[in-house]
Swiss-Prot record:
It is found in: Secreted. This is Subtilisin-like protease 3. Residues 35-116 form the Inhibitor I9 domain. Secreted subtilisin-like serine protease with keratinolytic activity that contributes to pathogenicity. Belongs to the peptidase S8 family. GO terms for molecular function: serine-type endopeptidase activity. The gene is SUB3. Residues 20-116 form a propeptide. Residues 126-397 form the Peptidase S8 domain.
Length: 397
């Protein structure tokens, strides 16, 4: 009898441990103090989700009254193709309560997310378009299918885009802003990447429609939660406009590893949006960066005009493809141009080619695989365990 009682107690203890959500506590100097992302288990209904939020808000308010905490509580909720969660500013007692809710899958620290661009080089040549449309290097002509991404919507999730720039005339609209109240591109990074994926002069998919989604400030930084909120908005917008299956999303940004960030981009891809992501500029294995380390998306490393890995580019088995990223000329706010280098510049080349492929009938689910099938195996010194395949648009040149 005593043995049965001990076993029962043991099983109850195991059940209690299993019910507790996992806490991704990786630490690091990019952690935003007292800010968290909470992800619910698959299958949690909308009603249960709202009930959980109400309970968390009540617990937070109670703890705030007891301890005089200055935390703000629940901020934003997201639902990306059935992947539900939220972010907020909580004290430790409230987080303990959240972790013990059996509807919660995991909790992680919110973190700073930054641009994946590097330096400006004035008067550099434009070479990326010629490179992705020819099997041999050195060609300056850009050869592409006349559909040029027509009928496809590209979401530029970045620092915003100068929607009045002549490069985008008649094909762009402002989407949303998750970082501040300034609906402009005060940094220039987002305008540059948009110019590469869909600009009239400097772009790959010259006829694609563009949506500006601002998740990073003029200083080039934001948060994981802000990026997730932006992705959530993109999926909702694409669904409302019947664009799922005819959409692409460029993320020329990143931070340290985040399961929530990876899950968000995975759900966007599964919903019917082709997601291109910058590998990062730390010259390290991209498996340690997010959203670059999400297996479901198309992760782009950066190459030079000489078909060599850019010195700054991340590498590793998670890399899907190389694309031009060193000294890329593109649009700048105010109607001008500028030259930037980074995996931020490689990703929009991939995004633009992806949009062009979708316009030609390739399914969103197959775009990245198709790119890898026709890519040129020419990159020298790609990095340990890294593909040597360079982006090619299949023009036949």
């Amino acid at each position: 009898m005593g043995c049965i009682k001990v076993i029962s107690v043991f099983l109850a203890a195991v059940a209690a441990v299993d019910a507790r959500a996992f806490f991704h506590n990786r630490g690091g100097n990019d952690v935003i103090p007292n800010s968290y992302i909470v992800v619910m288990k698959d299958g949690v209904t909308a009603e249960d989700f709202e009930s959980h939020i109400s309970s968390v808000s009540a617990t937070h308010n109670l703890n705030k009254a007891k301890r005089g905490s200055e935390t703000a509580g629940h901020k934003d909720s997201f639902d990306i193709n059935g992947w539900r969660g939220y972010n907020g500013h909580f004290d430790e007692a409230t987080i303990e309560s959240i972790l013990n809710d059996d509807k919660v899958k995991y909790v992680e620290h919110d973190r700073v997310v930054k641009l994946a661009a590097l330096v400006t080089q004035p008067n550099a040549p434009t070479w990326g378009l010629g490179r992705v449309s020819h099997k041999a290097k050195g060609n300056k002509d850009f050869v592409y299918d006349s559909s040029a991404g027509q009928g496809v919507t590209i979401y530029g999730v970045d620092t915003g885009i100068d929607i009045n720039h002549p490069e985008f005339r008649g094909r762009i609209r402002w989407g949303t802003n998750t970082v501040d109240n300034d609906n402009t591109d005060g940094n220039g990074h987002g305008t540059h990447t948009a110019g590469t994926f869909a600009g009239t002069t400097y772009g790959v998919a010259k006829k694609a429609n563009i949506v500006a989604v601002k998740v990073l400030s003029a200083g080039g930084s934001g948060s994981t939660a802000g990026v997730i909120k932006g992705i959530d908005w993109c999926v909702t917008d694409a669904r409302s406009k019947g664009a799922l299956g005819k959409a692409a999303l460029n993320l020329s940004l990143g931070g340290s590893f985040s399961q929530a960030n990876n899950d968000a981009v995975t759900r966007a891809q599964e919903a019917g949006i082709f997601v291109a992501v910058a590998a990062g500029n730390d010259n390290r294995d991209a498996k340690n960066s997010s959203p670059a380390s999400a297996p479901a998306v198309c992760t782009a490393a950066s190459s030079t005009i000489d078909d060599v890995k850019s010195s700054f580019s991340n590498w590793g088995t998670i890399i899907d493809i190389y694309a031009p990223g060193s000294s890329i000329l593109s649009a700048a706010p105010g109607g001008g141009t500028r030259t930037l280098s980074g995996t931020s510049m490689a990703s929009p080349h991939v995004c633009g080619v992806g949009a062009a492929m979708i316009a030609q009938g390739v399914s969103v689910a197959q775009v990245c695989n198709r790119m890898k099938q026709i890519a040129n195996a020419v990159i020298r010194n790609p990095g340990t365990g890294t593909t040597n395949r360079l982006l090619y648009n299949g023009s036949g040149q």
